[in-house]
């Protein structure tokens, strides 16, 4: 159905595990599809809250077909440039996670939520050697599959913030640069001074600029393939009332992905980082908002990848 979150209209989908374990039969698949189509017609964001468990198929092949049906509905929503946000509670497994939920533009999860196609109990029953297999939201964010982990009592506040960013009601107009600005003399520094400044460990990094230039910054994580490269920061924020997508290269002394052969740590960009930036660009196109990038990097990470 439809509702308001802080005066912002949205279509709401709620999957409750108390009803047949949150599985997706013909009726559930039809209702989800109709809700996604309603969001497309009304041109308002769609928010889905999921609590499902198990891989059971209530009606055999007809139930299985709902995965494709709902996935096509999400694709149609994306083609119309309508945001789709999903909240994963504990647990979120089975058909729903493996179909439309994992195709969302922004995925938020509760802490320690059990996530995956099969439940951890089913996996350990099939393979006794995988009892310690990480199957939680913390693992999924590390491997780039979800955007944010938020406590339940703070989800509404974050949703309201995100919806405000995705409801751009103000557009910054282009202006002509004045002649007095074009004639301004900027301080000259020779190349040696510039190189020394760039290597100064105490100079401002990307996060400093994000905190001091933009407001309501909502960071998104992961490349949706394999990892979340921390050398690339992506997210949505506001500047002068205009929502923008931000891609910032965080040159730092730490690189969680790897260490150099000398033992020092640096912030080279991995293939995951490039995929993460590409995803942010695609989201900017989807949400119809400008893109702002901060370039500050020692270069790409050299390796087999």
Annotated model-derived regions:
Residues 1-4, 156-244, 248-253, 265-266:
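Intrinsically disordered, low-complexity segments enriched in small/flexible residues
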Residues 36, 40, 74, 78, ...:
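Structural signal for hydrophobic packing residues in well-ordered secondary-structure cores
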Residues 6, 20-21, 25, 58, ...:
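Generic, ordered loop/turn and secondary-structure boundary motif
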Residues 27, 65, 95, 102, ...:
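Charged, alpha-helix-enriched surfaces in structured cytosolic catalytic cores
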Residues 4-78, 85, 235, 242-305:
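Cleft-lining beta-strand/loop regions that shape enzyme active-site pockets
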Residues 24, 62, 132, 147, ...:
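Catalytic cores of large soluble enzymes that bind and process phosphate-bearing ligands
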Residues 30, 91-92, 131-132, 228, ...:
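Residue-level recognition of alpha-helix initiation/capping sites
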Residues 53-172, 288-291, 295-305:
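Conserved catalytic cores of soluble enzyme domains
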């Amino acid at each position: 159905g439809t509702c308001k979150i802080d005066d912002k209209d949205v279509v709401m989908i709620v999957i409750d595990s108390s009803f047949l374990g949150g599985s997706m039969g013909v009726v559930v698949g039809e209702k989800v599809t109709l809700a996604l189509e309603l969001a497309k017609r009304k041109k308002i964001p769609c928010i889905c809250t999921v609590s499902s468990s198990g891989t059971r198929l209530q009606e055999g092949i007809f139930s299985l077909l709902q995965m494709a049906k709902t996935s096509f509905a999400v694709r149609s929503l994306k083609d119309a440039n309508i945001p789709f946000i999903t909240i994963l509670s504990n647990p979120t497994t089975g058909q729903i996670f493996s179909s439309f939920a994992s195709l969302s533009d922004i995925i938020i999860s509760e802490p320690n939520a059990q996530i995956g196609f099969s439940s951890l109990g089913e996996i350990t029953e099939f393979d006794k050697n995988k009892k310690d297999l990480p199957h939680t939201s913390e693992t999924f964010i590390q491997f780039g599959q979800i955007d944010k982990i938020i406590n339940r009592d703070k989800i509404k506040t974050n949703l309201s913030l995100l919806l405000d960013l995705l409801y751009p009601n103000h557009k910054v107009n282009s202006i002509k640069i004045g002649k007095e600005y074009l004639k301004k003399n900027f301080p000259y520094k020779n190349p040696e001074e510039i190189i020394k400044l760039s290597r100064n460990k105490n100079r401002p990094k990307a996060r400093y600029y994000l905190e001091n230039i933009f407001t309501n910054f909502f960071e998104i994580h992961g490349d949706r393939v394999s990892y979340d490269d921390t050398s690339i920061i992506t997210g949505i924020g506001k500047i002068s009332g205009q929502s923008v997508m931000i891609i910032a290269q965080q040159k730092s002394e730490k690189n969680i992905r790897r260490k150099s052969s000398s033992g020092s740590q640096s912030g080279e960009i991995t293939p995951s980082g490039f995929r993460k930036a590409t995803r942010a660009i695609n989201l900017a196109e989807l949400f119809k908002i400008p893109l702002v990038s901060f370039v500050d990097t020692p270069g790409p990470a050299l390796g087999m990848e």
